[in-house]
């Protein structure tokens, strides 16, 4: 198409506020306070108009809610690529709280005949919302008045495609309807060996008017992974069901319906590919598959190392140990995949679930220990593509499902839920979500990584929101007493606040950082160690929790070094080696007769590596060598295995993502130090 640039014009004075965009293929305008996505729309002057696009429509029980697009704004505007976001709500006066809100984003590239559409729904009511369906409609090419310009039905070609290894097509002649539905049972019975975060298959529908020489193909992004989904096409157009009719779906599926708890959100995407009438099935399928699994460039690990944007986790090839490298990759791959609209990107913890922490329900890890951050570090040091996709998929879930987007309790808003049932504790009684928020279970580094890798400003906003939530929690009485909480509580808080300070240079983060550091110093003076209450009459050392604090203090030290802080960190590491090591060279789980079993927590390896970094004394590395070897030689949980439908998810494999999230940085950080000392 030659050199084409995007042209964007904001509305003039005395006109309704809106944005007009041209990209060489499309010419459209979006307007505030509108009941439809487009105010005007043209694709090369034929077939499609503003009225060709209807929805989204949200069905709840017997009602259908219509959208109101309240405000459009430019997120990104350049000559090659542009992003427009519309925010709004579904119109219904019977909804509690602030109602059901949404955002819609339109991603447009210069000279390209497709629009990537993302739709994000927010349950800002006090209750659980169980949508009956969530649908978009794209009408078949017409005259702009709801009439097809084709004189004969034979001019309309419909096409439906779904793929596993190869795409299976079903073509409808004379405008006949074709389409399909993806359920848990469909996936349960279909063999697929792809890493699902990277790719599973595609799911598409097309309607083409041969007389007008124009058509449109719709592809739902990662439809299988985010079931239930449906798509159909007929002579009247394409129906895109981000949530298909759940009343009908429940007749053929035993999976529980999709239900949005109070404060929960979820984004789904689809591509609208406009084309001429001669576009082949191969070309439509090719674009659809590229949408599902686009080419992704990467930066060499050596560049990441030189840039010093990641921790010290890099080794030259001559120092790398093949067995260790293989083990780290296996551990990264060894997590369960949980298909489902509200589940993909997370997995339940088998241990928490078996303990009954979910009252019989699955206990979702909610990205405990910052699983995405571990994956982004693994991607940086290896360049393996799927590690990036693991991180991106987890962050997408995290930003929507694991963060509280609405609550009457200000201590919940923008915070991250601790591992719990139904992702946020559930809201059956209509009194908001009943999960727990604690500084020990709120992370931001993975969100900041995602922001740096993708440029999506929503991740930065989410990280800042979590940071503000942490500040609010630190002001509560629970966090004021010395030794009344575990070392990991304020330790994780310090880690998050340090990352935000490095990112934003906002002094509000540093003020609380200084307060936390002083709390640790006073804690040591009062008890002689970082003891914390465990039973009603006992205070003990918990090595892995103390290690969280050590790691966080070290992050702060790298930003704001001082001799006093260095001495405090070395003292804490020495306290671990003197009191938490078994006679056989491992670390105790917890310092209590009923819990002093051999530990396998790798967090203590990070503490040992920090001791070495600050002193140069290899004795600290020697304390950790048996724990390191035990961890590296352990078998990673299964990423593949039996499929089982539980609640609203299809679970494949058994490994909880928190295992890699917790262990990667300690293992890799210790590994780089020990390899340089020829201990490995």
Regions found by a protein language model. Give the residues of each.
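Terminal, non-catalytic domain-edge segments
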Residues: 279-308, 313, 317-324, 515, ...
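Well-ordered alpha-helical scaffold segments within catalytic/enzyme domains
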Residues: 86, 120-124, 271-273, 315, ...
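Long, well-ordered core segments of solenoidal/helical folds
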Residues: 298, 326-345, 390-406, 457-478, ...
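Surface-exposed interaction regions enriched in Ser/Thr/Asp/Glu
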Residues: 1-7
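Beta-strand/loop-rich accessory regions of lumenal/periplasmic or secreted enzymes
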Residues: 17-296, 343, 347, 366, ...
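Helix-terminus loop motifs that line ligand-binding clefts
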Residues: 386-436, 458-469, 492
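Low-complexity, Ser/Thr/Pro/Gly-enriched N-terminal "stalk/linker" regions
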Residues: 288-361, 403-427, 664-680
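Solvent-exposed loop and edge beta-strand segments that line ligand/cofactor-binding
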Residues: 253-255, 259, 355-368, 423-440, ...
């Amino acid at each position: 198409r030659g050199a084409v640039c995007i042209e964007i014009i904001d509305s003039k004075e005395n006109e309704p506020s809106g944005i007009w965009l041209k990209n060489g293929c499309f010419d459209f305008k979006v307007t505030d306070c509108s009941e439809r996505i487009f105010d005007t729309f043209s694709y090369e002057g034929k077939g499609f108009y503003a009225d060709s696009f209807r929805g989204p429509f949200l069905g709840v029980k017997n009602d259908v809610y219509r959208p109101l697009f309240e405000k459009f704004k430019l997120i990104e505007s350049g000559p090659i690529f542009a992003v427009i976001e519309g925010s709004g709500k579904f119109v219904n006066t019977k909804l509690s709280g602030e109602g059901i809100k949404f955002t819609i984003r339109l991603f447009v590239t210069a000279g390209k005949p497709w629009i990537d559409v993302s739709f994000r729904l927010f349950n800002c009511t006090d209750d659980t919302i169980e949508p009956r369906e969530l649908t978009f409609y794209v009408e078949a090419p017409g005259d702009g008045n709801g009439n097809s310009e084709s004189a004969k039905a034979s001019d309309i070609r419909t096409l439906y495609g779904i793929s596993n290894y190869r795409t299976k097509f079903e073509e409808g002649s004379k405008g006949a309807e074709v389409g399909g539905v993806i359920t848990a049972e469909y996936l349960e019975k279909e063999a697929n060996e792809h890493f699902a975060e990277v790719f599973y298959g595609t799911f598409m529908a097309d309607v083409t008017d041969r007389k007008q020489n124009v058509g449109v193909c719709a592809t739902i992004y990662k439809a299988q992974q985010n079931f239930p989904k449906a798509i159909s096409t007929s002579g009247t157009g394409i129906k895109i069901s981000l949530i298909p009719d759940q009343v009908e779906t429940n007749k053929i599926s035993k999976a529980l319906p999709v239900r949005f708890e109070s404060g929960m959100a979820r984004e789904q995407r689809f591509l609208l590919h406009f084309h001429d009438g001669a576009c082949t099935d191969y070309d439509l399928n090719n674009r659809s598959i590229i949408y599902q699994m686009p080419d992704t460039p990467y930066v060499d690990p050596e560049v990441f190392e030189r840039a010093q944007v990641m921790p010290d986790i890099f080794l030259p090839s001559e120092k790398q140990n093949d067995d260790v490298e293989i083990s780290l990759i296996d551990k990264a791959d060894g997590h369960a995949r949980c298909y489902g609209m509200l589940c993909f990107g997370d997995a339940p913890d088998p241990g928490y679930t078996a303990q009954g922490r979910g009252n019989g329900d699955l206990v979702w890890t909610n990205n405990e220990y910052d699983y995405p951050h571990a994956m982004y570090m693994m991607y940086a040091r290896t360049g393996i593509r799927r590690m990036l996709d693991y991180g991106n998929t987890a962050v997408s879930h995290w930003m929507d499902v694991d963060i509280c987007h609405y609550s009457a309790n200000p201590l919940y808003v923008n915070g991250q839920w601790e591992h719990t049932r139904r992702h946020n504790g559930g809201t059956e009684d209509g009194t908001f979500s009943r999960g727990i928020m604690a500084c020990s279970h709120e992370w931001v580094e993975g969100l900041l990584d995602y922001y740096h890798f993708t440029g999506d400003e929503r991740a930065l906003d989410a990280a800042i929101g979590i940071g503000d939530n942490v500040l609010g929690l630190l002001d509560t009485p629970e966090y004021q007493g010395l030794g009344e909480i575990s070392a990991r509580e304020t330790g994780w808080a310090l880690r998050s606040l340090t990352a935000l300070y490095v990112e934003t240079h906002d002094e509000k983060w540093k003020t609380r950082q200084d307060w936390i550091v002083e709390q640790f110093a006073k804690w040591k003076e009062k008890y002689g160690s970082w003891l914390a209450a465990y039973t009603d009459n006992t205070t003990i050392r918990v090595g892995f929790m103390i290690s969280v604090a050590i790691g966080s203090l070290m992050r702060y030290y790298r930003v704001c070094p001082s001799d006093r802080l260095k001495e405090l960190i070395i003292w804490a590491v020495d306290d671990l080696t003197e009191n938490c090591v078994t006679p056989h060279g491992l670390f105790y789980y917890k310092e209590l007769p009923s819990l002093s079993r051999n530990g396998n927590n790798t967090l203590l390896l990070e503490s040992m590596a920090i001791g070495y970094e600050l002193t140069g004394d290899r004795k600290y590395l020697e304390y950790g060598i048996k724990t390191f070897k035990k961890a590296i030689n352990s078998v990673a949980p299964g990423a593949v295995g039996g499929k089982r439908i539980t609640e609203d998810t299809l679970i494949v494999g058994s490994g909880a993502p928190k295992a890699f999230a917790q262990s990667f940085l300690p293992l890799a950080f210790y590994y780089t130090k020990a390899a340089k000392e020829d201990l490995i």
